[in-house]
Amino acid sequence: MEDFVRQCFNPMIVELAEKAMKEYGEDPKIETNKFAAICTHLEVCFMYSDFHFIDERGESIIVESGDPNALLKHRFEIIEGRDRTMAWTVVNSICNTTGVEKPKFLPDLYDYKENRFIEIGVTRREVHIYYLEKANKIKSEKTHIHIFSFTGEEMATKSDYTLDEESRARIKTRLFTIRQEMASRGLWDSFRQSERGEETIEERFEITGTMRRLADQSLPPNFSSLENFRAYVDGFEPNGCIEGKLSQMSKEVNARIEPFLKTTPRPLRLPDGPPCSQRSKFLLMDALKLSIEDPSHEGEGIPLYDAIKCMKTFFGWKEPNIVKPHEKGINPNYLLAWKQVLAELQDIENEEKIPKTKNMKKTGQLKWALGENMAPEKVDFEDCKDVSDLRQYDSDEPESRSLASWIQSEFNKACELTDSSWIELDEIGEDVAPIEHIASMRRNYFTAEVSHCRATEYIMKGVYINTALLNASCAAMDDFQLIPMISKCRTKEGRRKTNLYGFIIKGRSHLRNDTDVVNFVSMEFSLTDPRLEPHKWEKYCVLEIGDMLLRTAVGQVSRPMFLYVRTNGTSKIKMKWGMEMRRCLLQSLQQIESMIEAESSVKEKDMTKEFFENKSETWPIGESPKGVEEGSIGKVCRTLLAKSVFNSLYASPQLEGFSAESRKLLLIVQALRDNLEPGTFDLGGLYEAIEECLINDPWVLLNASWFNSFLTHALK
């Protein structure tokens, strides 16, 4: 195509087109269709104006041969093909001398006879579609639009075609010739299909009224008006020495660009303080399930029926007692709450027909645990705006916490395989379109690697709990509904299994806004003795509620069974995201896909099969104090999934801030590793921004400690 363009068009046109493309950072050698389109458009603009003059009487005449009379004036001013600054200068001077309204976009021509700007369009599509796009883009009554197509059709504003029949025929013939020449070289199809719609970037966006006043108020120092600030910005050359640029911007800024060397960065400072505690909405590695295989009982699938059936599989219940109190709570209330659940479940069984849902009696212990009547009364602002000392509550700074080892163990556990499958293949959605075989193949390989992963169990558990809680919050706003925490899976042998982790009791839930909070009490089974890591369980009251017989290599052993109880809260928006946790599968699949793509582009063929089936190859997984950890491709899939799942389970403002700010430092370090000689200013400020997010969140603290390991190894 490039050769064709150079042969087919006048060298002056080719040169102008190259210049125009370079001005927008485009390469004529690469974007050859665009190159051809620009040349065609330029040629049509020149042909439009050729031979058209205005005589001394102001009439328009056509002079095709010889030296025209010196008194003749060109009918059209050509704006297209000039560089932007020059083009705007011409437009401004025309507007000043003729009083014509200034266009928002650079037009192509000015017609001195009709006193109007003209926008010329050349399209490979339907003329009326292109006409509408142009009209929509320029939104000006005053600019005349004239569209030509390669098929000989044309369309103009109000069907006013400006030129005589013959001049237009000349343009149409030329376009038809270009099309035939392209077709004979096999270039036409690609050229025809490459046309994109009009980009609607406003050149001159007029600001008026309040916005104009705000714009004038918010100008940087030393600028008197929006116009001269705009002129300054337009004239700002983006390359060159940064220090000079900054001092040119403002006298107050003196940023010294410091070279960023291997010795420059220091590790992030992690906070001191008591060890951080568990803050997830449900237990992760410490959860215990009561399960039924191949459920076929009456009402199977109704959560309450399933829960009762699961409870009946356990025979080691005993009189509950508190083994780890909650520091601040009224612990006997937690104990009473569990006893109430047991009693009310027993009541259900004594009924003729088990109900589908169970609302708990509003006892003292539940009212306390669910914060009933605890919220301060809401008062309308109108009624209290005259109160002289009206102010917001003083809130305490959050207490700093140090990194504890349990969160790394939680993460390691999330990456492990369980002996059950937690997603069916269609969980990620069937192919709708006959989309490449490759996509399905990747999905199937990926699913095989993660379907048994514990992080996938957490996804399904999270989806279930959040869905059930949101449903109950809307359907039974005033009730203390008992919600079983359930998940479903398949065993190695393919048998269905229903699991009960414990129960949630929901408080009052009149959720008007996305952020309105619903309180709930969670009660979860576990075999973990809380006294081993009491700091992890700071927010929980833990009861011992039974003894469980476990099969081990040496035979049966009896272990105490615990119940982890705490009050917690969530909101509509958090539940909505919790319900969509399956997205984590998609996110990690996309990350794996980009690894496959990188590999495939090097080898110039699809490497999906090799990628998943070459068991000998190891891949980098992450950094630890020991160095770069490596593992199989399956391990990489599961690690990426676990990270995505933990980002969802431990979502917080601290995580948002840390991710955004630490990424900047990460990019600088990567630039250093790639020998790009990065420079920085105010590195201290960046460290401050990162470290102000390191307060007490276990997942953020763990990520910060991983970041430090990365720094150490990256800069060796």
Swiss-Prot record:
GO molecular function, one term: metal ion binding
Cofactor: Mn(2+)
BP term (GO), one: cap snatching
Subcellular location(s) per record: Host cytoplasm; Host nucleus
Record-listed E.C. numbers: 3.1.-.-
One of the Pfam families matching this protein, by short name: Flu_PA
UniProt binding sites for Mn(2+) 1: 41, 108, 119-120
Motif (Nuclear localization signal 2 (NLS2)): 184-247
Keyword entries, A-Z: Cap snatching, Endonuclease, Eukaryotic host gene expression shutoff by virus, Eukaryotic host transcription shutoff by virus, Host cytoplasm, Host gene expression shutoff by virus, Host nucleus, Host-virus interaction, Hydrolase, Inhibition of host RNA polymerase II by virus, Manganese, Metal-binding, Nuclease, Phosphoprotein
Cofactor note: Binds 2 manganese ions per subunit.
Gene Ontology cellular component annotations, sorted alphabetically: host cell cytoplasm; host cell nucleus
Positions contributing to Mn(2+) 2 binding: 80, 108
PTM comment text: Phosphorylated on serines and threonines by host kinases, including human casein kinase II.
Family the UniProt entry places it in: Belongs to the influenza viruses PA family.
Annotated function: Plays an essential role in viral RNA transcription and replication by forming the heterotrimeric polymerase complex together with PB1 and PB2 subunits. The complex transcribes viral mRNAs by using a unique mechanism called cap-snatching. It consists in the hijacking and cleavage of host capped pre-mRNAs. These short capped RNAs are then used as primers for viral mRNAs. The PB2 subunit is responsible for the binding of the 5' cap of cellular pre-mRNAs which are subsequently cleaved after 10-13 nucleotides by the PA subunit that carries the endonuclease activity.
Record text on subunit structure and interactions: Influenza RNA polymerase is composed of three subunits: PB1, PB2 and PA. Interacts (via C-terminus) with PB1 (via N-terminus).
HAMAP family assigned to the protein according to its UniProt record, in alphabetical order: INFV_PA
Listed name of the protein: Polymerase acidic protein
Organism: Influenza A virus (strain A/Silky Chicken/Hong Kong/YU100/2002 H5N1 genotype X3)
